[in-house]
From Swiss-Prot:
This is Phospholipase A2 inhibitor NAI. Belongs to the CNF-like-inhibitor family. GO terms for cellular component: extracellular region. Optimum pH is 4-12. Important decrease in activity at pH 2. Keywords: Disulfide bond, Phospholipase A2 inhibitor, Secreted, Signal. Its main location: secreted. It is found in: Secreted. The keyword Secreted applies. CDD domains: TFP_LU_ECD_PINLYP_rpt2 (cd23572), TFP_LU_ECD_PLIGB (cd23630). Heterotrimer of 2 subunits A and 1 subunit B; non-covalently linked. The keyword Signal applies.
Length: 200
């Protein structure tokens, strides 16, 4: 409601000149039940995330839709690995207006990229702000070590701790606070360059 009031009062000063509305949802598979939200004044595009969680030979697909900012639309692919046998890949598409009704969802393959010679601490703790680290081999274009501590994940879990390899694009998305589909989430994160295996 606050974002709608702000947008309507000050909409004439926005670069878009209008109040943007986007579908919002998160769910398993390729579809999810959506509702419509009036985006904040600084959000000028709708974003669809298609995510694959891969632990060969099994993979899990998730989809989410939210408001976003167009300055991150070029960051359309991100990848992270918290474990040598687990990879999470996400592809994103941006749209506005009628285009969102016909734009097909982003498509991800199930292929896992090969190791690239870099390494990071890795771990995953659900419902906890701590996890036990082990060394993870980075894959593909993963050249950053990502560390996340999160809380207040609503229906999912109360806390999260995560460390692993990540693409530079994922670190940039965290800097832009891309997780607005879950409005109550609080996240602290840090990215540092991954090191060659011989340096660990």
């Amino acid at each position: 409601m606050k974002s709608l009031l702000f947008c309507c009062l000050f909409g004439t000063f926005l670069a878009t000149g209008m109040c943007l509305e986007c579908e919002i949802c998160i769910g398993l598979g390729l579809e999810c039940n959506t509702w419509t939200k009036t985006c904040d004044a600084n959000q000028d595009t709708c974003v669809t995330f298609q995510t694959e969680v891969i632990r060969a030979p099994v993979s899990l697909s998730l989809i989410s839709k939210s408001c976003g900012t167009s300055d991150t639309c070029h960051l359309n692919y991100v990848e992270t690995s918290p474990h040598n046998e687990l990879t999470v890949k996400t592809k994103r598409t941006c749209c506005t207006g009628e285009e969102c009704k016909t734009l097909p969802p982003p498509v991800l393959g199930h292929k896992v990229n090969p190791p690239n010679g870099l390494q990071c601490p890795g771990c995953l703790g659900l419902s906890s702000k701590e996890c036990t680290e082990h060394l993870v081999s980075c894959r593909g274009s993963e050249n950053q070590c990502l560390s996340i501590i999160g809380k207040e994940f609503g229906l999912f879990f109360r806390a999260l701790s995560y460390k692993g390899c990540a693409t530079e694009s994922l670190c940039t998305l965290f800097e832009k606070r891309f997780w607005n589909v879950l409005e109550d989430v609080e996240v602290d994160f840090k990215c540092t360059p991954a090191l060659p295996k011989s340096s660990q």
